[in-house]
């Protein structure tokens, strides 16, 4: 990069954090080749590193930099799956007015991350942070659309964990959820 040899950069070998930081420079100086690489990365045909990134890293760029682009989308899709194979976990996401910065990005990022990986009746579900917690079905095709959706969910100034457990059980009973698909954890993400 410092020598201006953009055509020699092997994009699948660029670390996740470097890709996130220099994505605009790659596009500016090597647009055609970089866009071809990104198209393949979005389709899963080419590796784009994301192993050193956390969900909040990508969500922060979208929330505060309004910088959603194909690099962030491809990296989101290739984030490592840290969730055990047979584990459902429900995130209770606080998106209240007191949440900002990294706490808000963490809450939204984990809500989306776990919702996408849950199976069965809990797939694409997260829970609101409220006195009367409710399940919310994640909507949107892109990371940007999902972030905007989670950001607009209803919230309260507190949460009732007993009511959250009851909602999990009600959903299980309503959908005849087998024991192996029951959530193994409720993850409360809040600045309280």
Residue ranges and their predicted role:
Residues 1-106, 116-192:
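Long lumenal/extracellular ectodomains of secretory and single-pass membrane proteins
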